[in-house]
């Protein structure tokens, strides 16, 4: 279905066209009526400013590459908008011509913004003051875990509806080009707050954050010698799902942020990632290859890997040094770096990656050993079925056995160049006795992947997915545009406000990407950007007219 929305002109002021576009995006989220219903009270004075107007103003600021300050939103609603746009957004009264009128308008906008955040704030902690631990506990609102989870679900539904509204701008052809390839990554979103002080015992003015550490799963902790790891910033961690393209395929759609959730650094990265993927899938985006870094490889399988597979994603992952080699076994089959192999897989092939990282072998030998693993890999017979169970058979069975094995007489002829099992197991396991074995979904769930690790296909897929994800992170953090890494541009504290601002900035980044994509592909031109010309003369100058 066509989007029905026309992108406004590049930022250069809030025109009626941009205001209408921002209002249409908010309408497409379907969240403004939900917020109004949650804020409705049977008694008391009616709130004069609708939530839709404040949200549309923040969208306009994000599209303009301006900081989403409450003061800027007030100036836009009560000064920069035309009368027609104010009527469209339901802004009462006229422009705020005096300072007194502006302050009154500012109070209305600020009240409305905080009311919006209160509907979906999962944090009971007080903000904007550096408190002692005793005062922090005394001022913490009572909130049960069920209430916090419900508020978190409302918050994540809201911010993902903002991203979906920006994706809905794509036309039918652009949406159909997405084949399900997805990158998942967590990136720090620094907060406008200093961290807690170990010397004074005072809390952070935004206690919803945590120290972001570059290593591991980004939690604050000590290294193996008991020395605290270097803290990068006081931040929240944004888990972002990004649409991607197959490796080597010509660009057919822009790569956009499709899912988002924020949490403290290192706080249940697997569960947060699974919620993001579930949101993407629930909105109708097809699942496909899923690339992520080692922080997710180490997650609890029941929190991340199994939910991701249940949603239909096929993981493409890397491993830490302590995760290499044999990772699991089932029915005698060995799970070696993500794939199931014959139990007679030679030790040099099992230890190939560990030896490469230990500089015991070179890349040429390593590539040959990775290629040699293919003969020992179990053959897919059928599945996985709807329950996740898969039937795999011995590589020395079938009409075209890849191995010569004395336990499989049919594989002994012809005597060609196929690898030969020289030392079969003394007590053959089920994989050596049966035609096939059934692998349950939980066997080696943390490490299993469908592409042989370090194979050319794995390298191409993993590099493409990871580069796409890191590219989107850098794109959204560009100081000239969304500046996601600049906390001074996001001064309202709390996880609810930070999540809303992050979603608005990613929404604006998506719109900027769509606009750039269409500019590159307009008129049937190749969707490959050329570097700006620096030479004074070019052979292209002599092309004939027409």
Language model feature labels by segment:
Residues 41-52, 228-231, 464, 490-500:
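Structural motif
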Residues 1-70, 81-161, 528, 546:
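Dynamic "connector" segments at or just before major functional cores
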Residues 324-332:
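Short, charged, surface-exposed secondary-structure boundary motifs
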Residues 45-55, 75-78, 88-89, 107-294, ...:
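Polybasic low-complexity intrinsically disordered regions
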Residues 180-183, 188-193, 197-214, 220, ...:
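Long, low-complexity, polar/charged, intrinsically disordered or flexibly structured peripheral segments
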Residues 331-384, 390-393, 445-455, 459-491:
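Short amphipathic alpha-helical "interface-anchor" segments enriched in bulky aromatics
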Residues 461-545:
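Basic, amphipathic alpha-helical segments enriched in Lys/Arg and hydrophobic/aromatic residues
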Residues 24-44, 216-220, 454, 482-490:
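Short amphipathic alpha-helical segments and their helix-coil junctions
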